[in-house]
């Protein structure tokens, strides 16, 4: 461990080590300026273009120059068009963000009132929860389940005659249908 609170001014004087378990090594030592600067080089060599030209005269093969091919989509386009495109992209991005927020609010932030349970993103009464759990998740099977449930309910209820249609008129209609079937046969 290092004992804090050493005086850096007393660098030259050595203190005897104390027997308390701490070293008296200073945490920071001053830097010498000579360590930071490198001596300047004796000779500086600067290569110029004239030094490379003799290589061409000697017949050495140089790689062929390849023409640069750059395509700029903004060349010849006005600043007004660039700003318009930037604004359109910003509006498209903001529209996507708004739709995402609306979707999340619609899809996940559903709270049902008392006495209702959230089942398949719909609030249903607690009494009908067992009916909805019997249904399968596919839409076609849900459709057939509802139809079968309607047929069972229709059979359990006694057939009632509408007040505007009497039993006699039903019998007349059935007789007319049978006569029409006999004539066509």
Swiss-Prot record:
Organs and tissues of expression: Pituitary and less in adrenal gland and testis. Expressed in the hippocampus throughout development. At P0, highly and broadly expressed throughout the cortical plate, but is down-regulated overall at P8 and P14, but remains relatively enriched in layer V. At P0 is expressed ubiquitously in the developing cerebellum namely Purkinje neurons as well as granule neurons. However, it becomes restricted to Purkinje cells by P8. This exclusive expression in Purkinje cells is maintained throughout adulthood.
Subcellular location: Membrane; Golgi apparatus, trans-Golgi network membrane; Endosome membrane; Cell projection, Dendrite
GO biological process: amyloid precursor protein metabolic process; apoptotic process; clathrin coat assembly; neurotransmitter receptor cycle; neurotransmitter receptor transport, endosome to postsynaptic membrane; positive regulation of receptor recycling; postsynaptic neurotransmitter receptor cycle; receptor recycling
Keywords: Cell projection, Cytoplasmic vesicle, Endoplasmic reticulum, Endosome, Golgi apparatus, Lysosome, Membrane, Signal-anchor, Transmembrane, Transmembrane helix
Protein name per UniProt: Neuronal vesicle trafficking-associated protein 1
One GO cellular component term: somatodendritic compartment
Record membrane topology: Single-pass type II membrane protein
